């Protein structure tokens, strides 16, 4: 493990630099500016020797008169290259962050559906926002400080060697001890930084859930619970941050102590070996000045280590995400529009954990007909609907579309044939028109309005002040449940796909909303192959075929009347729902 850490760090650096490579001209300019900045600082230290020797020991009036001009030019040039270097390095950093965020977001969008089942939105947002931002500190802030300070250290050591190499060598004896201290804190900070990455994901997740579910939080009195949970997460984050701070403090204090010992050794050597080592007063003071100047860059370099380790931990988190395999798309067949005949042949499906949730499922949906899946929660209905657009990949068996296995169709072509209307409608914080036209961005306003009318959405949209240009808020929060459903149906109508998946599209709606939704669904189902998932059996009476699922297996199939005649599982479900409906009417 100890031997792998430097190798792992080098690999991370190498991979990170591949994202910096496109911006190398600006990076090179920034590096040169920072080198020049450090060179000017080291030059000023050497000027101390010349100033003292030529002003007080061997007086050189010509040189003394030039000192103000030299200082003015040096400071002006130092300011220019400092600003140039800072601008260039920041430009590179923000460019890298922009590119990385775009790549990470694009990668997340194309990950398999089962990854979303396991990951939380808070963790994903933390990677896009926090982890990528840590990379910026490595690619700009840390790199700038590293170049400036390492060049200054080299420059000052060079000045010391030029002035008196004997004393300088004594100071260099302290360098291995600095390396030992830095190596110790390096490992500790990296380990803690991984915990910081994780806790930031947890903090984001808790906050995101509480904000999105604020109605549930308030109605069930969960405010104090959420605040306590958030406080615990932030306290854990604070403790990890403090561990990093302690490591940095040990690092800085240890390095400063080593440098102080080095300075003391040189002063003692200069005093006791004055007969052997002969230097001028200016040279001696210049060496002392150089050593004192070394404290700041050495301190910065040691604290910089913690920043670099945090950045590398962030980079590692980002790269681990980017290394996850994308949704597999080996299909090569492209179809403009299918008839819509679907067949499930001996279909099995198991989750990654090995739990089989579908067992030998076989059925056919004729083109242009409707099939409803019913059964208790967890019976496999939604899994079947998820297999059709290949959100999940089959464990065994074949699903065909117009006789072609869906694995042979390209994902884009396959999903182009389908529309989805689900219980949990997804609307974007945009206008109603853009939400209806989602995926059909080239649609005209007339086409959007026509879809709205067919979905019985135009009547409430036309009453809004901005009509179809009304923004709906985050996830359509400004609309009622029934209104959101009608927008989703309008979106499906506009897409005009030959296959329609209705996943609990009318559940949890009031009677008036359900009336509108049913009327809208009749419009969108015309001439389309429709797969319906429903709990309310009253909504699927007219389906051409009803399939009853239980524990991942098909137990019955037939029309509504046929299944009632069998007096099996479906009939039992229907009687229970009818009895509940009668009770509701009596109570009302």
Residue ranges and their predicted role:
Residues 1-40, 56-70, 85-89, 93, ...:
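Membrane-integrated ABC transporters
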Residues 2-6, 58, 94, 102-126, ...:
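Short intracellular "coupling" helices and adjacent cytoplasmic loop segments at the cytosolic face
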Residues 22, 26-36, 69-74, 144-194, ...:
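Transmembrane helices of ABC transporter permease
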Residues 25, 113-114, 130-139, 143, ...:
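An intracellular "coupling" helix at the cytosolic face of ABC transporter transmembrane type-1 domains
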Residues 32, 40-44, 81, 129-173, ...:
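Hydrophobic alpha-helical transmembrane segments of ABC transporter permease domains
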Residues 57-63, 159-173, 247-316, 321-322:
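Helix-loop-helix
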Residues 74-93, 140, 144-151, 172-196, ...:
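Alpha-helical transmembrane segments of multi-pass membrane proteins
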Residues 330, 337-588:
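ABC-type nucleotide-binding domain
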